[in-house]
């Protein structure tokens, strides 16, 4: 039993307590982070840049500690004309010659890269893209993975190549490394899909189709990863929804503005880099809120970047993955993987996990497949200690969640809880137990977002700060869990209503 059978079984008072605790903790935690703003500016290891010239931001300094967000801003400044060119070219092609859509993708991307990149960067990207088309002709999956291992090794070596970094500059270095990392996934998706395709479907895997996929500019550098199956299923003749497209782009722009405004007052990105700033909070209990908001700002970054790519993809007739789901609505870690980055989840599930085991495979085979999947996640994200810790914690949390769900699905467990606790009591017990999985899963993300130092600090605070602190943390996490369950039940109910 994992869901509330009927939301009306809970009293209004109980629901009020759950949401009251949730909202109060978030509001107070955010206020305490806001209260540290001047202390952080004074104690920071480097000086923040001047804020926007517009009042009242002109009186503040802006937190520029998040390299990914700053690099994205630099990318947009350099490449915004090519987003407009992409829209214009695709609008004309979809109107007059829909069959030339992929040539339009190739032309815009080739122009954008050739104008902005050094020749050495161009050689790297061209070689990577070409290598996957060549290996797909050999129809051997192990060669695809061998090639991918080689490129991932190359990317890790390039990250430490001072000569090349000095030659192209830091901005281009980041752009090329990130683009190559995404291109490895796109190359894998195309090659593995082609190898597994039926003979009559091979017309969908032509060179032009592949280059259009590999060089789709709106998702080239900042994602999301769109599987080749999705790309090949695009609807070239479909009427473009210009209003929906403008709305999608504006949504990303508005969230970017909201985040930039917030960074004049909430120095959460710097807090993720300097544990001393988190230590300045009133107590260990409120330090947990810093971890929560690190996750929320991380989520907003992907709402902006993925949202922009998804808006363009949908406009071009590509059935793109959904936008990231807010982490405040995710209470099982498996859902974090499924719904935060649907494109990456599809890639990992289809090309690694499902290739190693099936529904009827043994538990050992499934755990082994999960471990190998996270081994790939580790090397693809970069072979850093904090990524290794994050990957291991991800694996352990998902394995524990699988054991937990298997146990609570047993008829004996369900009969016992129903007999002694009733439907709602059984759900409360379920939530209390699941909270013990939710806490380490939530803190594991801090390793990926902020690094090992802040991850270790918050994890120690959760488990080594006394019984009272842990009980308070469990109670708040229990309320968070119940709120997410209530929202999910309501969302599922709406989906069923729409279906009927």
Swiss-Prot record:
Alphabetized UniProt keyword annotations: Acyltransferase, Developmental protein, Membrane, Segmentation polarity protein, Transferase, Transmembrane, Transmembrane helix
GO BP term, pick one: epidermal growth factor receptor ligand maturation
One Pfam match: MBOAT
Record GO terms (molecular function): acyltransferase activity; palmitoyltransferase activity; protein-cysteine S-palmitoyltransferase activity
EC numbers for this chain: 2.3.1.-
Family: Belongs to the membrane-bound acyltransferase family. HHAT subfamily.
One Gene Ontology term, aspect cellular component: endoplasmic reticulum
UniProt name for this protein: Protein-cysteine N-palmitoyltransferase Rasp
The reaction(s) this protein catalyses: N-terminal L-cysteinyl-[protein] + hexadecanoyl-CoA = N-terminal N-hexadecanoyl-L-cysteinyl-[protein] + CoA + H(+); N-terminal L-cysteinyl-[protein]-C-terminal glycyl cholesterol ester + hexadecanoyl-CoA = N-terminal N-hexadecanoyl-L-cysteinyl-[protein]-C-terminal glycyl cholesterol ester + CoA + H(+)
Protein source organism: Drosophila melanogaster (Fruit fly)
Compartment(s) of residence: Membrane
S-S bonds: none
UniProt KW Acyltransferase keyword: yes
Transmembrane regions listed in the UniProt entry: 15-35, 73-93, 105-125, 134-154, 206-226, 243-263, 293-313, 372-392, 429-449, 461-481
Function text: Required in hedgehog (hh) expressing cells for production of appropriate signaling activity in embryos and in the imaginal precursors of adult tissues. Acts within the secretory pathway to catalyze N-terminal palmitoylation of Hh; this lipid modification is required for the embryonic and larval patterning activities of the Hh signal. Not required for Wg signaling.
InterPro entries xref list: MB_O-acyltransferase, MBOAT_fam
Major location (coarse): membrane
Catalytic residues in the record: 381
Membrane topology of this protein: Multi-pass membrane protein
PANTHER family attached to this UniProt entry: ACYLTRANSFERASE, PROTEIN-CYSTEINE N-PALMITOYLTRANSFERASE RASP
